[in-house]
């Protein structure tokens, strides 16, 4: 055991990446991969079973818990944004340097692409058998919707843009409230579960129109994968060239979310007064008694 542990420690030292931003990018990639793998995996199960193995609620539950797991995996390293819209909001608030935006976005999109690839491999035979060895983007035998979002037949472009805008703004407002130490901070370690709950609520209330992407990486990465995996360029033209809406609208919605939270909550929160020396002594004494 001793030699094995020593060998593992040496391997860890050799593989350790010293460039912090690269470590963070890898964490974002893996976290987003987990999000897409479990989230789109749940969609695949519902679609390919034609509703016998789940439904709309199970998809929303899966995406909510997938976000939670992705944050738990990557949070300590990168903050687990898992979404370019979240990274954009944090950079806009000067909580993150702007250099992180393109790097995080690329890593998140790559993670989503790889997550879609895993789902495709996992359900490879079922996908091909679903429509007699053909791949359709839309229609009763469409399977591209397993991976990326597409608008419902009733939805026009303006309403769809507003749908993604509001969904992302709501997400950002809630995320900012969760991570704001001067609001009602979530107990440490529960942030991931709370953000997952936010995604679940957005899905169950705003998912009907187009599947609530509210995440450019989660939508574009898998969409690009489907284009390369056999569905072709139709994934970009279906829905009146819908593909750009889940990219542009969430980024604008994230800025709206920042303004709404800051103007109505963030700018008005009062910082707690600094503790006095006497209070610090009392706190230290209480901690000492608890240890005894």
UniProtKB/Swiss-Prot annotation:
A motif (NPA 2) lies at residues 215-217. A motif (NPA 1) lies at residues 83-85. GO terms for molecular function: glycerol channel activity; identical protein binding; polyol transmembrane transporter activity; water channel activity. Residues 1-24, 75-78, 93-100, 178-189, 265-292 are cytoplasmic. One of its GO terms (biological process) is odontogenesis. Residues 43-56, 122-159, 207-210, 225-242 are extracellular. InterPro entries: Aquaporin-like, Aquaporin_3, MIP, MIP/Aquaporin, MIP_CS. GO terms for cellular component: basolateral plasma membrane; cell-cell junction; cytoplasm; nucleoplasm; plasma membrane. Belongs to the MIP/aquaporin (TC 1.A.8) family. Aquaporins contain two tandem repeats each containing three membrane-spanning domains and a pore-forming loop with the signature motif Asn-Pro-Ala (NPA). Homotetramer; each monomer provides an independent glycerol/water pore. Could also exist in other oligomeric states. This is Aquaporin-3.
């Amino acid at each position: 055991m001793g030699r094995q542990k020593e060998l593992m420690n040496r391997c860890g030292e050799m593989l350790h990446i010293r460039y912090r931003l690269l470590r963070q990018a890898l964490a974002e990639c893996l976290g987003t991969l987990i999000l897409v793998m479990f989230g789109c995996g749940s969609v695949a199960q519902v679609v390919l079973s034609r509703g016998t193995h789940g439904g709309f609620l199970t998809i929303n539950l899966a995406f909510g818990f997938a976000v939670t797991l992705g944050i738990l995996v990557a949070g300590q390293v990168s903050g687990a944004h898992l979404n370019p819209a979240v990274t954009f909001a944090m950079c806009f608030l000067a909580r993150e340097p702007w250099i992180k935006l393109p790097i995080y976005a690329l890593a998140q999109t790559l993670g989503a692409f790889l997550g879609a690839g895993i789902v495709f491999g996992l359900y490879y035979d079922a996908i091909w058998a679903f429509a007699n060895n053909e791949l359709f983007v839309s229609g009763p035998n469409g399977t591209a919707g397993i991976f990326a979002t597409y608008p419902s037949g009733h939805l026009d472009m303006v309403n769809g843009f507003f749908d993604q805008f509001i969904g992302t703004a709501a997400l950002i407002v809630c995320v900012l409230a969760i991570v704001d130490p001067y609001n009602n901070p979530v107990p440490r370690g529960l942030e991931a579960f709370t953000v997952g709950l936010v995604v679940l609520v957005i899905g169950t209330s705003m998912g009907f129109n187009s599947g609530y992407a509210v995440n450019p990486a989660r939508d574009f990465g898998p969409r690009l994968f489907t284009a390369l995996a056999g569905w072709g360029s139709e994934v970009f033209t279906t829905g009146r060239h819908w593909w750009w809406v889940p990219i542009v609208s969430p980024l604008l919605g994230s800025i709206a979310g920042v303004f709404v939270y800051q103007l109505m909550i963030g700018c008005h929160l009062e910082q707690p007064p600094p503790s006095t020396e006497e209070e610090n002594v009392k706190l230290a004494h209480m901690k000492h008694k608890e240890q005894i």
